[in-house]
């Protein structure tokens, strides 16, 4: 399990983390807010954090060469329109990828499903193979 302090979340959002875990079946990214969500404008804060986390998640997907099934557990949003916007924003970030990647949908549990074409092993697998040689 890899905890990554997200960059680019702004001074207001200093305690957000992305937890990234790779298994044989899929990669899972969990967006964790820490204690940064206040009581005022909570939905606006959640939306902003999720949009920034989507940008960093797309970056990490490319850097770590994650592929196959990728699930992202964003912070739950009440608005279906906000979920649709998040899905579209993520697809826009994925469109800049050299490998075909598709933000498929957001499940009833609020988890975004992504597929990304597998061409090489993810970076963690490449490193572990090199160590074993």
Task: Give the ranges of each region predicted by the language model.
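Single conserved hydrophobic/aromatic residue that forms the stacking wall/gate
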Residues: 1-13
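Conserved glycine-centered short motifs in functionally critical loops
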Residues: 15-133
